């Protein structure tokens, strides 16, 4: 398991737990839209997603607003 907030996440078969760590006040509109697309609504909110290319791309768009943990499926 690792925690990351940088743009180093790669698509894989892993499951990601994505947590919103910062608010969206003052953020760009596309960053707000990306968080909503991930299903994040407020600080501290967590969602679980597969690490496919779409999810990884969205996480890499807002690394300064989220923290990511990889959960082993085994």
UniProtKB/Swiss-Prot annotation:
| PROSITE patterns in UniProt | RIBOSOMAL_L30
What is this protein identified as? Large ribosomal subunit protein uL30
For this record, the Gene Ontology CC terms, alphabetical, are: cytosolic large ribosomal subunit
Question: Which Gene3D superfamilies does the record associate with it?
Answer: Ribosomal protein L30, ferredoxin-like fold domain (3.30.1390.20)
Q: Keyword annotations for this protein?
A: Ribonucleoprotein, Ribosomal protein
Q: Which SUPFAM superfamilies match?
A: Ribosomal protein L30p/L7e
Q: Extract the signal peptide range.
A: none
Question: What HAMAP family does the database record attribute to this sequence?
Answer: Ribosomal_uL30_B
Q: How does it assemble?
A: Part of the 50S ribosomal subunit.
Instruction: Name its GO BP terms in alphabetical order.
Output: translation
Q: Which InterPro entries does its entry note?
A: Ribo_uL30_ferredoxin-like_sf, Ribosomal_uL30_bac-type, Ribosomal_uL30_CS, Ribosomal_uL30_ferredoxin-like
Instruction: Give the Gene Ontology MF terms in alphabetical order.
Output: structural constituent of ribosome
Q: Which family does it belong to?
A: Belongs to the universal ribosomal protein uL30 family.
């Amino acid at each position: 398991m690792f925690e990351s907030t940088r743009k180093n996440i790669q698509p894989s078969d892993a499951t990601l737990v994505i947590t919103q760590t910062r608010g969206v006040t003052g953020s760009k509109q596309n960053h707000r839209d990306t968080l909503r697309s991930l299903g994040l609504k407020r600080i501290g909110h967590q969602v679980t997603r597969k690490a496919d290319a779409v999810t990884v791309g969205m996480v890499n768009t807002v690394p300064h607003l989220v923290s990511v943990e990889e959960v082993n499926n085994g």
